[in-house]
Amino acid sequence: MKDKRIYGMFGPKIRAMRLEQGLKQRQLAELLGTDKPMYSKMELGARRVRRDQVPKLAELYKVDEKELMTLWLADGVYAALREEDESLRLDAIDLAKEYFMAQN
């Protein structure tokens, strides 16, 4: 059976932080303006947290917003490349890195 997780890093991270603070999924769903089933899918990696929700999560969990945003962005890269051949994934990442470096 194929793994249903599209976003593999961010969901488990926010789940771990929620459990560490003893919060319920319902509470987080409310904070983010969504429902519990959708929030559950976010934690499972089946749905992506919206960019504007990341700062809210960082504030709630009292974690560095840049660190959480970096993880969120990396998750997007993972989702875009996850089904590609390994060498193609790595080449694409290297090329993107070169492009970003040339822009600075």
Language-model segments: what does each one mean?
Residues 1-20:
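A short, Lys/Arg-rich alpha-helix, primarily the initiator
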Residues 12, 22-23, 49-52:
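Residue-level signal for the short linker/turn that defines the boundary of a DNA-recognition helix
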Residues 15, 26, 55:
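Residues within the helices of the helix-turn-helix
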Residues 22-41, 60:
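Short alpha-helical DNA-recognition segment
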Residues 69-104:
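Short, charged recognition helix plus adjacent turn
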